[in-house]
Structures are given as C-alpha cells and as structure tokens.
A protein has these predicted regions:
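Small-residue-enriched core segments of transmembrane alpha-helices in multipass membrane transport
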Residues: 102-103, 216-225
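Short alpha-helical transmembrane segments in multi-pass integral membrane proteins
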Residues: 10-66, 122-188, 229-280
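Hydrophobic positions within alpha-helical transmembrane segments of bacterial inner-membrane proteins
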Residues: 1, 18, 76-77, 149-157, ...
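Transmembrane helical elements of multi-pass membrane transporters/channels
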Residues: 25-29, 33, 37, 55-117, ...
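Helix-terminus/linker motif at the lipid-water interface of multi-pass membrane proteins
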Residues: 1-13, 73-106, 124, 164-171, ...
Length: 280
C-alpha cells in the first residue's frame, strides 16, 4: 500500500511498488523459514548435516513431484492463457477478470486449509492401514468444504457492491463485474470448496498420476479452448468465466468419481507409503 500509493513516507512506485512489496514478502518469509529450520530445536532431527540420500526413498518422491509439477503447470498455464485472452479484450476486461480471480482465490485459499488437513490425515490413516477411517474422514471434510464454500458464496453476493468498490472506482469495470461475473464466482464457491478438499485428499493418498491427467485434460483440453473461443468468437469476459466453470465442473466430476471409487486407497502403498509434501 505504501509503495504503490506513496504513503508512510515511501515513494509512489505504482505497479513497480507492488512487485517490490511482493518480492520483499517472499524474501522475509523464506528467511523466517530458514531461520526456524536451522535454529529451532524442534527441527534438530531434520538438519541438513544429518541428511542421507536414499535412492530407494527418493524415487517415489520424484514420481509424485513430477506428477504434481505437470499438474500445477497445466493449471497455471491455462490460467495464464485465460488472462492473456482477457488482456486482449481491453484494460477494463482485464481489470474485471483479475478482481474476480482474486475473489475466487480468497475463498479457495482459505478452504485450502481443509485440503492440507485432509492430505495429512489421509496419509496418516492409510499409512497405518486404516482405510475406512481415511474414507470416513474424507467424506466429512468434503462436507466441510462445501459448507465453507457456501458461506463465501453468500458473502460475495451479499456484499457485492462493497467488495467491488474496494477494488475499483471504474464504472466500466463495475459494470463488467455486475453483469454476471461476481454471481458466477459466488455460485461456484461451494463447488470450489469440494474440489480443493478432494485435491488434498488424493494428494495425501499419493494418487497424483490421476490428478495430473485430470488437470491436463481439464486445463488444456477444456479451459484453454473455451478461453480462445471467448476471445475470437466475441463471448467476452463471461465466456472466459464459462471456461473457469467448465474446468471446475470437470474437476468436481472426476475427483468425486475417483474418491468414491476408492481405488486411491492403494496408491500410497504403491508409492512407498511416504507422506506427501504440503500442497502449494
């Protein structure tokens, strides 16, 4: 805020200030984590000087990591493509798109806490051969994700004008958001809550190969083509967000099917039974 608008005695740098602030926050966060790792007693067992490379244990981590890297790359790549399509529609469209996207992330990132909990608990229960407990816990978290998403959706609808005013004073941008985009974001919050929880549950079960292929098909095979059509066929911003909805619907259907098929319960054993890393 200070670097963008020049408050608190700081220079007014605009977009450059936002970049500096974001980079500074990342550096501070990294320094804090490194400090905890190297100097905290609770991390003494994990010091670098005590590490030993085990190829037997490294191979499953490499497989899981590559699956998730491809999955995340497909998701981020499709989102970048959609943003580029919005940018080609004009500055107002791009602004409205980014505001809507940040609102979607606000709800999703909060709900992601449930996904991380599910990831850890699924890994724990499957590692101790408690498949039924893992499945029951997963169903509970799915319901929690849906309720949390519903709360965010209602909040977005109820405070739509106030929320939009916090982001912009532009009449054009407000009209674009009020033409159905905010409604679209709000309606998909319960769906997003379920999808994010399912994502965490399946990562905890090391079912990453399925997640990779589902995202490749959904992101590159569904979302990207719809975004392209929105740009070239005159569908506008609502066309891009129809693509977002199609992607999330695809993820909901495929991940629900995978979870309730229960084939994921064997994936962790096949990958060595090692607990997966926290989601990013």
């Amino acid at each position: 805020y200070g670097l963008i608008y020049g408050h608190f005695g700081l220079p007014r740098l605009g977009l450059k200030g936002a970049a500096i602030a974001a980079s500074s926050a990342q550096l501070v966060g990294a320094a804090t984590c490194l400090g905890i790792f190297f100097f905290s007693r609770s991390m003494a067992a994990y010091r670098a000087v005590q590490w030993r490379l085990s190829l037997t244990r490294f191979r499953p981590l490499l497989r899981i990591g590559s699956d998730l890297a491809i999955r995340t790359g497909a998701l981020r790549g499709s989102l970048v493509f959609a943003t580029s399509c919005a940018a080609r529609m004009g500055a107002s469209v791009l602004s409205a798109h980014e505001i809507a996207f940040q609102l979607m992330l606000l709800g999703s990132d909060v709900i992601d806490g449930l996904a991380v909990a599910g990831q850890a608990l699924v890994a724990k229960y499957l590692g101790s051969a408690q498949k039924e407990t893992a499945f029951a816990m997963g169903k509970t978290l799915i319901r929690c994700g849906a309720v949390a998403g519903l709360i965010f959706g209602i909040a977005f609808l109820g405070a739509q004008d106030t929320i939009v005013s916090l982001f912009t004073n532009s009449t054009d941008v407000k009209l674009l958001l009020g033409a159905g985009v905010i409604l679209w974001v709000a309606l998909f919050q319960p769906l997003n809550g379920i999808v994010f929880v399912l994502d965490g549950l399946l990562i905890g079960a090391h079912d990453t190969r399925f997640l990779m292929w589902a995202m490749l098909i959904g992101g590159l095979g569904i979302f990207v083509p719809i975004s392209w059509m929105a740009l070239h066929w005159g569908w506008g911003l609502m066309g891009i967000w129809a693509g977002v909805g199609a992607l999330m619907s695809w993820r909901l259907i495929t991940l629900l099917y995978r979870f309730f098929s229960r084939t994921w319960s064997a994936s962790q054993k096949q990958s060595g039974g090692m607990m997966s890393n926290p989601r990013t």
